[in-house]
Amino acid sequence: MHPRRPEGFDGLGYRGGGREEPCPGVRPFGGGAEMGHWVTTPPDIPGSRNLHWGEKTPPYGAGTPLGAAGLNEEPGLGAGGPGAEQLNRFAGFGIGLASLFTENVLAHPCIVLRRQCQVNYHARNYHLTPFTIVNIMYSINKTQGPRALWKGMGSTFIVQGITLGTEGIISEFTPLPRELSHKWNLKQIGGHLLLKGLTHVIAMPFYSASLIETVQSEIIRDNPGILDCVKEGIGRVVGMGVPHSKRLLPLMVLIFPTALHGVLHYVISSIVQKLVLLFLKRENSHSLPTESSTSVQSMLDAYFPELIASFAASLCADVMLYPLETVLHRLHIQGTRTIIDNTDLGYEVLPINTQYEGMRDCINTIKREEGMLGFYKGFGAVVVQYTLHVAVLQLTKIIYSTLLQNVS
């Protein structure tokens, strides 16, 4: 239940040291150069503004040091004319937008099928490869229409917003650090991870409601309102709202697996992103661009290492925690009287009637009745999701490279 995108932007730097006094000759905030700087700052990645074990990722490519630019000049803007300057100013926005669009919109059908396969204990076809996933996507789209693959997308955005807002509020009114400085210690790390765990626990009822909207079959489900996720989440807490069966697990039973999954996903993705950024930084330092391609290459070196690191971090965390996510989703969905699509056929519906007593019982039952591969049901959807993400990133890189070369 982690947000798939960054919690913030390192470029703002609002949690650094004391407020710096403006130097003489520097224009106040709001000028053209400053606005250009905010636009071209590389998009951050999950955890990068929280776990600063080394230096922060340089906002500009290795081939264009910050000190080489004048007070009123944008770093990384070569002498390519106003066209190249304009493209550079909006390059970060465009590239980051493409990545956000892929993760939250284009990949949503993969998330829908992935979750339906995870909670479908009836399934004989585990959909471990992308080929069977694409086939079942086609079948569901043919019988139920395109809406069946995009259901619950609005609620996923709401859960992300609740998660980010909760984290910000807790960090403001408690000593738990939302970010870690360069000189961190074990106490700060413990408080920081505690903040992450509390955030996921508070957002847990809304995550359950969003999960139900995502896996509920389009055949029998009514058109939900955009705030139904919030209403159902509050109803789950106070014990009101849609009636559930006696097999519904209390929220206290869900706290540990929910917090464990959220914290582990954050830690794994943060470590992987740091390692990938360190590797890419060393690679870029050994291959400096030529003068003719400095503007183009410096722009690409500024933005794409961040996106590649974010991609690798999310992929590794999703793959490593996939079995735990399967258990988590089955516990959340139990007792909610949810009807899902038949992921074997694509044109029937199935009820969810599990009777797990808790996390340990769920793990033992899956292992006994479905085998070890039962924890990886729907894994082919992950392959499709990240393959699509790679394709969009590569296409975006080609488009920006072509545009910048044409105007330079």
UniProtKB/Swiss-Prot annotation:
Subcellular compartments: Mitochondrion outer membrane
InterPro entries tied to this protein: Mitochondrial_sb/sol_carrier, Mt_carrier_dom_sf, SLC25A46
An annotated GO BP: phospholipid homeostasis
Biased composition (Low complexity): 66-76
DNA-binding as UniProt keyword: no
Topological relation to the membrane, as annotated: Multi-pass membrane protein
Chain intervals for the UniProt region annotation (Disordered): 1-23, 52-80
The UniProt record lists the keyword Transferase: no
MF-aspect GO terms: protein-containing complex binding
Transmembrane segments annotated in the record for this chain: 93-113, 157-177, 189-209, 248-268, 304-324, 373-393
Gene Ontology, cellular component aspect: mitochondrial outer membrane
Protein name: Mitochondrial outer membrane protein SLC25A46
Lineage: Eukaryota, Metazoa, Chordata, Craniata, Vertebrata
